[in-house]
C-alpha cells in the first residue's frame, strides 16, 4: 500500500483556536480526518506528525525514507521562512513533496513571503485554508499512481 506522510510544523497544534479568522476553525484533527478519508478511498496509507521542534520534523523526514513513504505533504509553518535544516532533510531523502499553507503567505508580512522549500517542492498551495490540504493529498495520490 502506498504511503503518504502528512507533516505539520510549529503552532499548528493550536489550529481551531489560534487566529481563527486567519487559519479557520478546523482543528488539526479535523484536517487529518478529512485527509484520512481521501487516502482510505484511494488505498493509500496516511501517516502524520506535528511538532513545534525543527529537529523532530527533520528526524521524521529521515525516518520516512526508511519506512517506504512515497510522498510528503508538509505545512512547515514558521519554519518555511527560516529552516535550511528542513530543506536539507527534504533534499537528503529525495522524496517528492507539496508545501501547503493555510493562509496566503504572499499577502502577509514581507518576512513570510520567502520559503526555503518552495523551489524544491513539486508544488505549493497557499491561501486556500484546509482545502489546500485536500488538494495536496489528491495531487500526491495521483503522482503515486493512484486515483483521487
UniProtKB/Swiss-Prot annotation:
GO molecular-function term, one example from the UniProt record: 3-dehydroquinate dehydratase activity
CDD domains, sorted: DHQase_II
Gene3D superfamilies in the record: Dehydroquinase, class II
EC category name: lyase
GO BP field: amino acid biosynthetic process; aromatic amino acid family biosynthetic process; chorismate biosynthetic process; quinate catabolic process
Entry keyword set: Amino-acid biosynthesis, Aromatic amino acid biosynthesis, Lyase
Entry EC number(s): 4.2.1.10
Site positions for Transition state stabilizer: 18
Residues at which substrate binds: 75, 81, 88, 102-103, 112
Catalytic activity annotation: 3-dehydroquinate = 3-dehydroshikimate + H2O
Involved pathway(s): Metabolic intermediate biosynthesis; chorismate biosynthesis; chorismate from D-erythrose 4-phosphate and phosphoenolpyruvate: step 3/7
UniProt xrefs under InterPro entries: DHquinase_II, DHquinase_II_CS, DHquinase_II_sf
Catalytic machinery residues: 23 (proton acceptor), 101 (proton donor)
Family, per entry: Belongs to the type-II 3-dehydroquinase family.
Subunit structure: Homododecamer.
Primary role: Catalyzes a trans-dehydration via an enolate intermediate.
Cited HAMAP family: AroQ
Name listed for the protein in its UniProt record: 3-dehydroquinate dehydratase
Amino acid at each position: 500500500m502506498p504511503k503518504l506522510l502528512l507533516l505539520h510544523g510549529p503552532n499548528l497544534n493550536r489550529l481551531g483556536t489560534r487566529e481563527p479568522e486567519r487559519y479557520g476553525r478546523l482543528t488539526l484533527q479535523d484536517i487529518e480526518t478529512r485527509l484520512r478519508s481521501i487516502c482510505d478511498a484511494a488505498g493509500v496509507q496516511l501517516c502524520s506528525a506535528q511538532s513545534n521542534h525543527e529537529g523532530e520534523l527533520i528526524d521524521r523526514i529521515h525516518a520516512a525514507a526508511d519506512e517506504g513513504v512515497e510522498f510528503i505533504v508538509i505545512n512547515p509553518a514558521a519554519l518555511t521562512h527560516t529552516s535550511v535544516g528542513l530543506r536539507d532533510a527534504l533534499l537528503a531523502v529525495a522524496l517528492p513533496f507539496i508545501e501547503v499553507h493555510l493562509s496566503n503567505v504572499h499577502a502577509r508580512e514581507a518576512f513570510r513571503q520567502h520559503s526555503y522549500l518552495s523551489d524544491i517542492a513539486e508544488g505549493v498551495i497557499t491561501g486556500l485554508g484546509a482545502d489546500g490540504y485536500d488538494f495536496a493529498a489528491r495531487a500526491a495520490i495521483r503522482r503515486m499512481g493512484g486515483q483521487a
